[in-house]
From Swiss-Prot:
SUPFAM superfamilies: FAD/NAD(P)-binding domain, FAD/NAD-linked reductases, dimerisation (C-terminal) domain
Group of enzyme by EC: oxidoreductase
Cofactor details (free text): Binds 1 FAD per subunit.
Annotated S-S bridges: 48-53
Protein name, per record: Dihydrolipoyl dehydrogenase
PANTHER family per record: DIHYDROLIPOYL DEHYDROGENASE, DISULFIDE OXIDOREDUCTASE
Binding-site list for NAD(+): 186-190, 209, 275-278
Species whose genome carries this gene: Chlorobaculum tepidum (strain ATCC 49652 / DSM 12025 / NBRC 103806 / TLS) (Chlorobium tepidum)
GO molecular function: dihydrolipoyl dehydrogenase (NADH) activity; flavin adenine dinucleotide binding
Enzyme Commission number: 1.8.1.4
GO biological process, any: 2-oxoglutarate metabolic process
Subunit structure of this chain's protein: Homodimer.
Length: 469
């Protein structure tokens, strides 16, 4: 372990940031018997628990229930007129987030991790200066420091958020009323989820995505299926498009929609949500002073999360790559194992599952068909439709499919891609299959309970197996 140069080491490990990566790292370090502290300038749990993953999913659940309640007669249920109460949905969402944050506090206390409320700055000599809420300063010494400060929304010139008419996902989580109309700039995970939520809540939503398709990193067939589903739900989607001349007025926002090959048109909406990605939360940390190198707004690290400065590690969004909570948690274990003198295996990004929680939901892991072909594989592809699933029919959720990509030479699975009701709940099996090279035959020969949506995975594997002879 790196020894402190100028400060008596008060801690073996100091973690900056308490999101999924930070609190997992602190707890993991404590389990090794390392004296550990965690510094958080806002609320325990970080963005994920308080302003990201958790409250977003709570809001999406409210929209799902409302959507189902609008057509209950199909299921033999009569409820009369239904309406959407955004204030109550937001209240429930905030309560869910609060409960999760309290859960993080409990876990840290149970692990005997010292929690410090304040803003941390790296000072050199293995030091951390923490400015407390009352303005007092506490100097810490640590043999090892893990930076887990997460990310902040990326700001695009001309689309600077004002918190009212031009908003980020944070404001979108706590709006006081459903806007009559909304422009969502960005067709990635955040944009897709927020667009679906507000469309179901009653807003007229338009998505503007610069890339040729929504969710551009996903399987093209999945992206196109999602676009069709959104358009069927009344969401307007413009891909290969951008906004110019954005103007804010008392009544809302206007902008010029520019699509290559088409004449510009004017868009008007009550508000505009900017969801164009994030950048690492590195400002004010003092990285330059301690020799931590950054690149394109993120901290540079090796495969074991070591930065360019001895004894300093970085995990999660601030490290770059896939910006996912479960990636941060996995990196937390890697960093702590490295600190403990182990030789942890670096994380393989293609094996990290990716999920988008609109309905239909999208989930994927491993290589797309195109990526597998480009990597030199001779591929075999298997498909199955949710419409053929007994469980999907029973639930009235027929939309969606499973696409599995295999190495035709070995039969081993290379990637899995799904869209459909609760598709995100099926990705664990596919992640396991990709991680350990399970073959199409192995999936087929595994008994899948009936009736479950997981049978769609087996059917897709069977389809691929037949194509392999």
């Amino acid at each position: 372990m790196q020894q402190a140069d100028t400060l008596a080491a008060q801690f073996d490990v100091a973690v900056i940031g308490s999101g999924p990566g930070g609190y997992e790292a602190a707890i993991h370090a404590a389990r090794y018997g390392l004296k550990t502290c965690i510094v958080e300038k806002a609320v325990l749990g970080g963005v994920c628990v308080n302003w990201g993953c958790i409250p977003t999913k709570a809001l999406l659940r409210s929209a799902e229930v409302f959507d189902l309640a609008k057509n209950p007669e199909t299921f033999g249920v009569n409820v009369g007129n239904v309406s959407f109460d955004l204030a109550q949905a937001v209240k429930r969402s905030r309560n869910v987030a609060l409960k999760s944050s309290k859960g993080v506090a409990y876990l840290l206390k149970k692990a005997a991790v010292e929690v410090l409320a304040g803003e941390a700055v790296l000072t050199g000599g293995a030091g951390v200066m923490v400015t407390m809420p009352d303005g007092s300063v506490r100097m810490l010494g640590a043999k090892n420091i893990i930076v887990a400060t997460g990310s902040t929304p990326r700001v695009i010139p001309g689309l600077e958020p004002d918190g009212k008419k031009i908003i980020t996902s944070r404001e979108a989580l706590i709006l006081k009323e459903v806007p009559k109309s909304m422009i969502v700039v960005g067709g990635g995970a955040i944009g897709v989820e927020m667009a679906w939520f507000y469309a179901k809540a009653g807003s007229k939503v338009t998505i503007v995505e610069l890339m040729p398709r929504m969710l551009p990193a996903e399987e093209a067939e999945v992206s196109e299926a999602l676009k069709r589903s959104f358009e069927k739900a009344g969401i307007t989607v413009h891909c290969g498009a951008k906004l110019d001349n954005v103007a804010v007025s008392e009544s809302g926002v206007s902008a010029e929609l520019v699509v290559e090959g088409s004449a510009p048109q004017t868009l008007n909406a009550s508000c505009l949500l900017v969801a164009v990605g994030v950048t690492g939360a590195i400002d004010g940390l003092g990285l330059d002073a301690v020799g931590v190198e950054t690149e394109r707004g993120f901290i540079r690290t090796d495969g074991q999360c070591r930065t360019s400065a001895p004894g300093i590690y970085a995990i999660g969004d601030v490290r770059g790559g896939m910006l996912l909570a479960h990636k941060a948690s996995a990196e937390a274990a890697i960093a702590v194992e490295a600190i403990a003198g182990k030789s942890p295996e670096p994380l393989s990004e293609p094996l990290i599952p990716r999920c988008v929680y609109a309905q239909p939901s999208v989930a994927s892991v491993g290589l797309t068909e195109e990526a597998a072909v480009n990597a030199g594989y001779q591929v075999a592809v298997g498909r199955s439709q949710f419409a053929a699933s007994g469980k999907a029919n029973a639930y009235g959720q027929l939309e969606g499919f499973v696409k599995l990509v295999f190495d035709a030479a070995t039969g081993k699975m290379l990637g899995g891609h799904l869209i459909g009701h609760d598709a995100v709940e099926l990705i664990g099996e596919l992640g396991l299959a990709c991680r350990y090279g399970v073959t199409a035959g192995g999936l087929v020969n595994t008994v899948h309970a009936h009736p479950t949506l997981s049978e769609t995975v087996r059917e897709a594997a069977f389809d691929a197996l037949q194509s392999m002879g």
